Amino acid sequence: DNSKISYAIKSNFGQLVTSTPLPYEPEFDVEFVDQGGVNKMIKRHKTILIVNIDPFSKNNSKEMPTPIFDLWAKNQIVYKINATSQKNAVTIINHYTDSIKLGINQFYYANILAFNGENKKANTILKKNHSIKLKLPSNMLIKKSTANFTWLNRTEIKKDNNGDHEIQQGIFVYSYPYINENLFSIEQQITFRDSLLKKHVHGSVANSYMITRKDELANNQAQAQLIKNKYVFSVRGLWRVENDKMGGPFISISTLSEDEKNIITIEGYVYAPNFEKRELLKELEAVIHSFEFTH
């Protein structure tokens, strides 16, 4: 009976992400197979977590599982947990979930970015306006460019049973003066976001503009984290268009400019009615995390 291990994995890796629109999507899709079910199909999966129970294992909950790359397939990441018992396995899973997730996401980002080109046109604008560069898809176009606000996006048409739908992935980069550290709070970040988007991002209907959702179903979340040894303040939430029906999820990171005079925010947003948004948002997350300052 591996139910305790299954529960630990499902509750840690398969929990619903509530900072996306309904219906909520799990952070990771989780499937379980026992040792006898590990066949060629399973070995083709891109992300695999192996839990091995051995009473004589020398491992214990103090040891962080290390990733194995390309074990059975190309562009694959495998984590193996060796535990002495079910209880020990659950302890290791609970203790190292965040580290394993971080490793998986960084691996995802690297694979996504491997397909992105230079996009010199967009990066020339980003360097001029904000002194940064991003690893962008080559089909990401410049929608708007000002001294402190840049909007890039790409659109595609996707079909489902109800016909054709436009899918949009966009990037905003904006900067504003760094007055004090209180600006690194979710309230201040959303205030600045809304004022800039009202000014720069208008819908097709008169008096329509993008704004952050703040209703009871909009579970906007924030966390401080390190990216490339630099402090960043990350916000996840939902956006909508005032006086129109568009909406979707966004993720942003904010950090100090190199001279520490300004805050630079890099945001990705998705518009994909009728379609799941997790992977589309993850593609933008990879782009955001690729930021580098230019000199």
Predicted stretch roles:
Residues 1-3, 11, 52, 57-120:
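Solvent-exposed alpha-helical segments and adjacent loops
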Residues 2, 11-15, 19-25, 117-144:
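N-terminal "mature-domain start" segment
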Residues 12, 16, 103-107, 143, ...:
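Structured segments of extracytoplasmic/periplasmic soluble domains
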Residues 26-87, 197-261, 275:
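Signature of long, low-cysteine stretches enriched in small and polar/charged residues
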Residues 48-51, 186-205, 277-295:
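Long, compositionally biased interface segments
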Residues 90-114, 134, 140, 261-295:
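Surface-exposed amphipathic alpha-helical segments
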Residues 101, 105-124, 154-172:
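Charge-rich, low-complexity N-terminal segments
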Residues 137-203:
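Secretory pathway targeting signatures of secreted, lumenal, and periplasmic proteins
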